[in-house]
A protein has these predicted regions:
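Active-site-proximal helices and loops of the catalytic beta/alpha 8
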Residues: 1-102, 138, 155-188, 198-200, ...
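Short loop/turn segments at secondary-structure transitions that flank enzyme active sites
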Residues: 43, 109-111, 255, 298
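Amphipathic coiled-coil/heptad-repeat helices and related helical stalk/stem segments
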Residues: 86, 131-132
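Carbohydrate-interacting/catalytic domains
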Residues: 126-129, 140-148, 152-307
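Active-site clefts of carbohydrate-active enzymes
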Residues: 1-11, 100-125
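Short, flexible loop/turn elements at secondary-structure junctions
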Residues: 41-43, 107-109, 222, 286-288
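Hydrophobic targeting/anchoring helices
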Residues: 134-140
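Short, flexible loop segments at the rims of nucleotide/cofactor-binding pockets, characterized by
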Residues: 79-81, 124-127
Length: 307
């Protein structure tokens, strides 16, 4: 470990190692500013992604290994025990803005008997796929750049090996094909809405609207105050939550199989007198998520209907 002597925090800082990192990163930044410098670092050493001139190590991004472990451990936990892990699931945002974090679902997690991403998840075959779609929706709505290792988009059940190519034949199976198609829609959504990436590292543009224990609701915004909301139900039962907003909401993407009869439902409960605030009741089916877009048209209709 270049940060601590003998790789142990209690042994003190490795001054020579820190000098080396700062020198190399500064020179690379000067000569090749187009190159991304990314640290795979599990320590809590500060300012890993701060510029060298400000006392940092000069990396552009740092792997958020805490987010990865907490999220995957949560999804590997039986449904009935997840409420006790809510704080751990939410913990990543308590330190996220200390560095420019990158969210990794990397090669490290799909080798050496660790199982693939989908195989780590609790539940039966159908529940694993449902949660995998929820996981990627959460990944794309959580602040931070994204890293997903090849084969993850196929929902591989076989661990990665350098001796064979990814299992492209999996796309001939309906569940894998539907997951792959969902990811395509999610990528398209990500590119279409700057609020999902424009202000990753500014806390003013992220907000928890509901923090579990069943439904987690995230709002992402951009400079122009355009926003999207993701509501994700990680329990095995349909769940409901209440949101207080100044507009209506319309669904533009969900993780549900088109053949399923369940739907995500948004209904108006009340409107505050002398206020633009609207109380919305949001019902999300078990192990599913929905992307919601503010709707000015719906807002006008709601006001007319309630007044």
């Amino acid at each position: 470990n270049l940060i601590y002597r003998n790789g142990k925090k209690e042994d003190g800082l490795n001054d020579a190692g820190l000098w080396f990192l700062r020198s190399v990163n500064y020179d690379l930044w000067q000569e090749h500013p187009e190159v991304m410098l990314i640290a795979e670092d599990s320590s809590d050493y500060p300012k890993v992604t701060a510029p060298v001139v400000y006392g940092g190590l000069g990396f552009d991004y740092k792997w958020d290994l805490g987010w990865m472990h907490d999220t995957l451990d949560y999804l590997a936990t039986p449904f009935g025990e997840r409420s006790a892990m809510t704080n751990r699931f939410l913990f990543s945002m308590s330190y996220f803005y200390q560095n420019n974090h990158l969210l990794p679902l990397s090669h490290d997690e799909v080798v050496h008997g660790k199982k693939t991403i989908i195989d780590k998840l609790w539940g039966n075959y159908e529940q694993k796929f449902a949660q995998l779609r929820c996981l990627y929706l959460y990944l794309f709505f959580h602040p931070g750049k994204k890293l997903s290792f090849m084969g993850n988009e196929l929902a591989e059940f076989l661990e990665w090996s350098e001796q064979r190519e990814p299992g492209w034949n999996l796309l001939s199976y309906p569940a894998h094909q539907k997951f792959h198609q969902f990811l395509q829609k999610l990528h398209k959504l990500y590119l279409e809405f700057p609020c999902l990436w424009e202000q990753d590292y500014d806390s003013r543009y992220f907000r928890w609207l509901h923090m579990g224990p069943s439904i987690f609701v995230i709002q992402r915004s951009d400079y122009q105050q355009n926003s999207l909301i993701a509501a994700i139900n990680l329990s095995d039962k349909d769940a409901q939550c209440t949101l207080e907003l100044d507009c209506g909401l319309v669904s533009i993407l969900d993780t549900l199989d088109p053949e399923e009869k369940n739907v995500c439902d948004v209904t108006v409960k009340s409107k505050y007198p002398y206020s633009d605030k609207i109380t919305l009741s949001l019902t999300v089916p078990a192990l599913s998520g929905v992307v919601l877009k503010p709707s000015e048209l719906q807002k006008k209709n709601i006001k007319k209907k309630i007044s």
